[in-house]
Structure formats: C-alpha cells, structure tokens
Amino acid sequence: NKYNIHLLKEIQLCPEAITSDCIYTISCIDGVKGEKSSPKWLKDRIEKSGIKSINLLVDLTNYILLEQGQPLHAFDKDKLSNLIGKEASPEDFSVRKAKDNESLVCLDGKKYELNKNITVITCCDKPVAIAGVIGGLETSVTNTTSSIYLEGAVFNPVTIRKSSKAIGIRTESSSRYEKGISSKNTIGAVTRAINLLEEFFTIPLPIINTSNFINNEDTFIKLRRNRIHKILGPLIINDQFEKRNLSDTEIVDKLLLLGCNLESKEYGWDVAVIPNRSQDLIREIDLIEEIARLVGYDRFDLNLPNPIQPGKLSSEQLALRDKEWFCRKWF
C-alpha cells in the first residue's frame, strides 16, 4: 500500500457499534472538485444498479459499494470545520449513541429526532451522520466541495439494524451492514477509492487513519474433489445420453470467477476467499453451492443414485433406542 496508514489512538468509539472485528477509518483528501461530473462509464454502472448519479465524488463512493461491497461516505471538510468552529482533524471524529434531545437533518432533507437506539458519527461531539445508514445534509458533498473526509467503516450489524428501524429508513449502505461485511477489505476499498480519485484529480498523498489494524492473512477452506462430485452429481451431456463429472478445469475456472486463490492438493484444493466474500463463503459446502450456481443447476443430473442406500441407526443409537423403550415399559 503506497499510502501511509496511521493508527488513531485517541478516537472515541462506541463499543457496541465498533466491536473487536469492526473498523473505523477516516481519510482527509484535498484538491477535489465537487462540480466535476462522472464519466459515462461510471454513470451507466451505478444507474444500471438503481442508484442516481449525483457528482463524481458521490458516484465514486457508490461505485466502490457496488464493486467492493464496502459502503463509504464523504463529508465536506470545510462544512465540518464551519460546524465545529475550527479546522476539522481525524481525531475530532467519534462514534457514539445519540442523546434523546438531539436531532439531525439528513441527506433526504428530513429532520430526524434521535435517541439512544441510534448510533451516530460525530465531529467534536456534533452529530454529522447516522452511522452506516445516512449522512447529514449540513456536511454533505456539493458542487462547491474542494476537500473531503472519506469514511470507510464496518459496524456491528445489530446496531445498524436498530438505527435503521428507529428512523424508519433503509439504504444501500444499511442493507449491506445489516447482513454483515468483512473488515478485512475496508482499507483495501478505501485505497481503491483514493486510486480512482487520483485518476480524476491532482491530490496530495492522503493518510488513511484507522481505529485498528485487521489481520488480512488468508484463511483456507479445504475443497475436496470427490465431495464436489458426490454433492452435485454428474453433468448431463447430449440430452441425457452421456453424463460426466465436472472436470478440474471447470471447477478451477468457477473458483477464479469468484476471485478465489487456489493451492492444488492431492484431494482437490485449498481455497482462499477474497475478503468481500468471506462472510458468506465460510465452509466447503458454500463453495460447492457457488460452483453449482455458476455452472447452472439445470445442467446436473436430477436422478438419484440407484440403488438408493437407506439410512440406518448405528449400534450406539440402537442401544439408546432399546434403553428408552425399556424405561417407558418400567423395566
């Protein structure tokens, strides 16, 4: 990573919202231009996904959401500074529970009355966003924006669900957080966003400030060739007259489509899953299901093996059954 990563030692974080496997990052990026519109490829990409194009800065955060599965939020640095009465710094940010007498006007133009069930992002203790759900209007990016603070975080899904329910809205970001995302990819997603910003603007090299460092070492899932064949069965070739198992090449191709890294083994493969899929690809059966989905469920033989082996009780289960029968008969 060509960017400096700085540990925020003094940042105040709500322990319920930022648990040990979560992360909060904030990066100051100067030299941007809020009036710059997005190129056609970027507009098309986000609008095809049902997201309205706003400007290049906002569109890039939404693009990273779609590409990496990591929500990002951009604050206008000058507006933050005006709000708190001094130049905003990374140490001014915090994550806490809202207070009962607080309110926040959000990006949708509505004023929300806050309470202790809602988690907020603050700058010098002033709420500037509802964490993981929606940003505040007062510090939003507009055509006059020249500097931003880029937030990339992973919050506890339970706190996001509570906040979303309390204010009665669900956003693209909150829906991702509620399902749970991996903090292993957060700094990578922020880095990707900064790389894209560098393609459009001349910006000083930013520092990525983070609440903690996440172990990004690959964890491997053992994927057995014979297990794939047993679970999925053979492929149907030539209108059911010919059948065969998936070849190693076909299996590897599908895993590479998922972005996995592979190590060949005698039994099959050790599979390292990319961070933004590490929440849903956890077990061997998860990988097998994805292979089947990418190949096409309808391409596999639907007929069960013949003869079908009936299930039977083990000797221990038989002994337990007999014991229970005698107990019921008062022996």
PLM regions with names:
Residues 1-321, 325-329:
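RNA/tRNA-interacting regions in translation and RNA-turnover enzymes
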